């Protein structure tokens, strides 16, 4: 694996796609109290808590993991 894969240092940053995480907050009112439910949907291909980035064919690496700023 190329050293560029660690930082996903692609020449064209538009080739890197950040897999996002969506959050849904539901507030349900009951007779006695308020309950909050948070549902976090994470992409099925994501295997850790960090974001994932895939560099295109024009980059020096493919399938690199990173959190682009």
From Swiss-Prot:
* Coiled coil residues, start to end: none
Q: Which GO terms describe its molecular function?
A: copper ion binding; zinc ion binding
What domain of life does the UniProt record list for this protein's source? Eukaryota
Kindly state the tissue distribution recorded for this protein: Expressed in leaf mesophyll cells, root tips, and at low levels in anthers.
Q: Which UniProt keywords apply?
A: Metal-binding, Metal-thiolate cluster
An example GO biological process term is: intracellular copper ion homeostasis
Which InterPro entries does the annotation name?
Answer: MT3
Function text: Metallothioneins have a high content of cysteine residues that bind various heavy metals. Functions as a metal chelator of copper (Cu) and zinc (Zn). Plays a role in Cu homeostasis, specifically in the remobilization of Cu from senescing leaves. The mobilization of Cu from internal sources is important for seed development.
- Family, as annotated: Belongs to the metallothionein superfamily. Type 15 family.
Q: Under what name is this protein listed? A: Metallothionein-like protein 3
Tell me the lineage of the source organism.
Answer: Eukaryota, Viridiplantae, Streptophyta, Embryophyta, Tracheophyta
